[in-house]
C-alpha cells in the first residue's frame, strides 16, 4: 500500500477486537461495535499554522491510537479497509 496523507491527516487500520464476550458468547458480525483502536500506517507533513509554519504531528507510523467510534472517513485501498482522519480526531496514543 502506498498512500501519503496531506497536512494533518493520518491513515489508520482498525485493530479488530475479540468476537467472543467474557462469558464465552460468540458475537455475530452485525452485533460487534467498531473497534476504537488502530495502528497508524501513514501521517501527513503536519498542521499548517496561521503564520504559515508547519507544526509536526504528535503521532507517528506504528503508533497504536484511540479514536471515536465514528471518527474519520472509511476508505478501501487494495482490499484493506482503512480510516483517514485528522490528528485532532485522535484521543490518545497507547503506550506499551
Curated annotation (Swiss-Prot):
Q: Which UniProt keywords apply?
A: Chaperone, Cytoplasm
The cellular location(s) given in this protein's UniProt record come to: Cytoplasm
Molecular function GO terms recorded: ATP binding; metal ion binding; protein folding chaperone; protein-folding chaperone binding; unfolded protein binding
What SMART domains would the database entry show? Cpn10
User: Per the record, what is one GO cellular component?
Assistant: cytoplasm
Signal peptide positions are: none
Q: Which segments does the entry list as coiled coil?
A: none
Report the main location listed first in the record: cytoplasm
The GO annotation for biological process reads: chaperone cofactor-dependent protein refolding
* Protein task: Together with the chaperonin GroEL, plays an essential role in assisting protein folding. The GroEL-GroES system forms a nano-cage that allows encapsulation of the non-native substrate proteins and provides a physical environment optimized to promote and accelerate protein folding. GroES binds to the apical surface of the GroEL ring, thereby capping the opening of the GroEL channel.
The family this protein is said to belong to? Belongs to the GroES chaperonin family.
Assembly and oligomerization? Heptamer of 7 subunits arranged in a ring. Interacts with the chaperonin GroEL.
This one is known as Co-chaperonin GroES
Name the source organism. Answer: Marinomonas sp. (strain MWYL1)
